[in-house]
Regions:
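Acidic catalytic loop of the alpha/beta-hydrolase fold
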Residues: 179-184, 211-212
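Alpha/beta-hydrolase active-site loop
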Residues: 81-100
Length: 254
């Protein structure tokens, strides 16, 4: 795969109406290589679109067009901060993305707490694939991982339960989780994968922590995702890529 600065990448800013909210979004697309796939990225709750631009450039350089948006009340976006509104925002952003790239296969990708949003919104879109990165099986499980005592469970809203969100969902699902994720340990990633159905694939990113994939985007993390979205690789090849990338990162630390 090519390096991010090889092909030209076009970046554009967009405003999206989501009910009573107005969302800020950034779209990145390749201009020197064909578009292999298109994806909407639901980022983590503590992030904003500008921090995802390096990821978008890397994706575009390798044939993946992407739209990243800020939820209502985040960054430049205006509106009420609620879980239901975040889900509405994802649906509105997905519909907007389809107008930008109408002839390409379109997927939904959630990262961190954005996995809850993406999974909850997926059945309200016609996305062809779903990717859940650095995620969790339920918001309660995420809260416990943050350190909230289990006896405070009644204070945690019963939202973003993957099993409920994906009930009846039949599209291909890829779960990606960092081997060294401390915020949402690998155990949560495996639990998430188990709830996604027998056809879901699990890709363990060797030696990756929680925030590394967007703070320091590299092809050994994002490359297999693009390949899977484009339908270029089988599960066995992805497992081989996992081993090879882990070996390379191990050598880099020596």
């Amino acid at each position: 795969m090519s390096q991010p600065d090889t092909p030209a990448v076009k970046i554009s800013r967009h405003t999206i109406v989501s009910g009573g909210s107005v969302l800020d979004a950034v779209y990145a697309e390749p201009t020197s290589v064909p578009i292999r796939c298109v994806l909407l990225i639901c980022h983590g709750i503590g992030e904003i679109v500008d921090r995802w631009l390096p990821v978008q450039r890397l994706l575009a350089a390798n044939g993946a067009a992407s739209l990243v948006f800020d939820y209502s009340g985040y960054g430049r976006s205006r509106g009420r901060v609620t879980a239901a509104q975040f889900e509405d925002d994802a649906v509105a952003a997905f519909q907007h993305l389809q107008t930008l790239a109408p002839n390409a296969p379109t997927a939904l990708l959630g990262f961190s707490l954005g996995t809850g949003v993406a999974a909850a919104a997926i059945c309200r879109t016609d996305a062809q694939r779903l990717v859940l990165c650095a995620g969790f099986p339920s918001f309660e499980a995420a809260a416990w991982s943050f350190g909230i005592p289990r006896w405070w469970t009644r204070l945690v809203p019963p939202i973003w339960r993957i099993e409920e969100s994906l009930r009846g969902c039949s599209i291909p699902i890829l779960v990606v989780h960092g081997e060294n994720d401390r915020m949402f340990p690998l155990k949560l990633g495996k639990e998430l994968h188990a709830l996604c159905g027998t056809g879901a694939k699990l890709h363990i990113a060797s030696m990756y922590g929680h925030n590394e994939p967007f703070r320091d985007p590299r092809l050994d993390y994002w490359g297999p995702i693009v390949d899977w979205l484009a339908g270029d690789r089988t599960a066995d090849t992805m497992e081989l890529q996992t081993l090879l990338s882990g070996a390379q990162r191990a050598r880099d630390t020596l």
